[in-house]
Amino acid sequence: NDLDKDRTHGDFQNQQAVYYQDAKTGFGGQNGSKNFCVHYGYADNSGYANGPLPYIYFGDGVARVVDHMYVTMTTYLANCVANGNGLTAPAGKDDWVKLVAIGYDEDGKEVATRPEFYLVGAEGNILEWTKWDLSALGKVVKIDFNVTGSNDNGYGFSQPAYFAYDDVAVRF
């Protein structure tokens, strides 16, 4: 894991870096840790994004409530939202990028609720670790994560579909 607060470095070479830096430890993870996870992936109706979504799952197949996790933008996404690149324009005042959680029960059926979290939107850009409540999913075995947004370059969602997460809290 890495951190990079220089948005001029925020290209695909820093797709796994976060913009956040803890003031006490100097590391990029939530609560000052060195480690965090980065996921990439999206699905839309463009026909260009048809791969599997990034996910987390319980390998033992037992459903549990994922209470919350902390999320933030990667430096790559932060740079493109602010400055654009060859594939996307900078985010405008009405643009948005959000995460959508899609839960699955022990039978592999999708649960009814899909919690959303805006990384970019009316509230601003999320450059620090922020708690995302996932408890509305109820007991799940697997959660897919879709990164979607309003920027479309004619080939579907055009912002980098990366997000970082840390400190996943599970109820046992």
List where the protein language model places each region.
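N-terminal targeting leaders for non-cytosolic proteins
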Residues: 1-52, 61
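A short, flexible beta-alpha/helix-coil linker loop
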Residues: 53, 76, 150-152
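Short, T/G/N/S-enriched strand-turn elements that build extracellular solenoid repeat scaffolds
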Residues: 54-58, 133
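Surface-exposed coil/turn segments at beta-strand junctions on protein surfaces, enriched
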Residues: 59, 92, 136-138
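A generic structural micro-feature
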Residues: 61, 91-95, 159-162
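Extended extracellular/luminal ectodomain segments enriched in beta-structured repeat modules
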Residues: 61-68, 139-140
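Extracellular ligand-binding interfaces
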Residues: 70-120
